[in-house]
Amino acid sequence: MTNIDSPVTYLDTDKAWDILASQRLGRLGVQSDVGVDIFPVNYAVDGESIVFRTAEGAKLTSLCSNSLVTFETDSWNEIAGYSVVAKGHAAPVTDEAEIAQVEALGLRPWVPTVKTTFVRIYVTSISGRKFSFGQDPIEKYR
């Protein structure tokens, strides 16, 4: 349980995976030559990895240059918000049997573009936080 003095709590690994699996839109952070690029992607959780589809372009080029990535998703309801961050290595899926496996996840592009490459993020660490909503506590300190 969270009180007003500690509205932020850390999630255990299982809860972080549960929240990650319950969402469909996240943000992929990839290092580029000029900084960190952040891409919104729809995704699916497959075991302890994250899978998304992409097309040729900046996202795939960045992943080929540097496979270390950070992935974030969040969710919220009336009483709390959640943020989950996963870190790992990303690689295009090239094995035919693995492609068939990830195709079965039902990932479809949200926009009408051709995205023929599946990418798997092999998660090496995952963390999450819960933010309990409440009234602005500033009055308490006046």
Model-assigned labels for residue ranges:
Residues 34, 58-60, 135:
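Short, surface-exposed beta-strand-loop junctions and turns on beta-sheet-rich folds
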